[in-house]
Amino acid sequence: TSARLDRLAPEVIRKCRPRLIIGKGGMSSETSEAMKEVGCAYLAFPGGAAVLAAEALPEVLGVHWSDLGMPEAVWHLRAKDLGPLVVAMDSHGRSLFKEVEDSVRKRSVLL
C-alpha cells in the first residue's frame, strides 16, 4: 500500500514534483502538505481490481529505484483507459480518507 513509502513520500514529492500519484490507501498529513506545495493529487485505485489495471497498463517504460524491491520501486508505465480512479487527496490539502475517518470518529462518539 501507499503507507509503506509514506515516510519517504514528502521528500520525493518535493524533489520530483509529480502531478499525480496512484495508490490504494491514504497517506499522511505530511505527504498531503508536500502535495499541496507542488500541486500534486493522489488518485485511489480500488483494491482487488488488478485485472483492470493489467489491461490498462500495456507497457512498462522504465523502472526506477529497483533496489528497493518490486513493490517499492517507481514504475513508469504507459496507461490507456486506466480506471476507475477517485481523487482521494487533492492539491489543495483535502483528503477523502481523513474526511471519512473524521466522520466515523464523530459518529462513534455518539454511540
Question: What is each PLM-predicted segment?
Answer:
Residues 74-111:
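Long, charged alpha-helical interface segments
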